[in-house]
Amino acid sequence: MKLRYSRVNKMLVAEVFDINKNKVSEIELNDAVFGAEVNDAVIYDVVRMQMASRRFGTAATKGRSDVSGGGKKPWRQKGTGRARSGTSRSPIWRGGGIVFGPVPRDYKYNVPKKVRKNALRSVLSLKYQGQKLVVLKDFPLDEIKTKKFKEVVDRFGLKKALFVTEERNEFLEKSSRNIAGIKMVRSEGLNVYDVLNHEHLVIIEPAVKKLEGALKS
């Protein structure tokens, strides 16, 4: 998509298209949100946090108290000439428990809200700078129709794209569900990993101002 930068008022300008790929207007983008300096470090921190949150952490081993059996003392304490032993499930025995093995755990952690906002501004700016940002005037769809949605995707030549809407739209969400490489999110659910994981970012115009309002400060 053709994008240009206006140096008169120091505002970023993007062209706005309808679903037939006709230019209908232009929109000024907030420089602090779509023209920010790209900070690779905060992007890395936030993506790492998101990936950690997706880990299940279900790996587990049995300690000496978890292994079945071993309740009977193998032999008497004294008089056999062998080392004393209280259970056959000791970690030093074959078939015994595991010492310091993995246990179920939660890998989730948080980074400061300010860092998350900074990372989101960085990836939005990255899409704008790389001319991978598409702004649609609207996406009129009054029924669940995957075919119609796919026609728009093909018209813009989108292979892997993230669509951002201002609010919940059942028709758009369900129509895009079975199209490979396409994902639909609401503006409040936009995240760094999804933006990076898709080649194009397609924003429905009303969602632009909502994003700017949430991220400009």
Curated annotation (Swiss-Prot):
GO terms for molecular function: rRNA binding; structural constituent of ribosome. The keyword Oxidoreductase does not apply. GO terms for cellular component: ribonucleoprotein complex; ribosome. Keywords: Ribonucleoprotein, Ribosomal protein, RNA-binding, rRNA-binding. GO terms for biological process: translation. Residues 58-90 are annotated as: Disordered. The keyword Ribonucleoprotein applies. Pfam families: Ribosomal_L4. It comes from the Bacteria. PANTHER family: 50S RIBOSOMAL PROTEIN L4, LARGE RIBOSOMAL SUBUNIT PROTEIN UL4M. Belongs to the universal ribosomal protein uL4 family. NCBIfam families: rplD_bact (TIGR03953). One of the primary rRNA binding proteins, this protein initially binds near the 5'-end of the 23S rRNA. It is important during the early stages of 50S assembly. It makes multiple contacts with different domains of the 23S rRNA in the assembled 50S subunit and ribosome. Part of the 50S ribosomal subunit. This is Large ribosomal subunit protein uL4. It comes from Syntrophus aciditrophicus (strain SB).
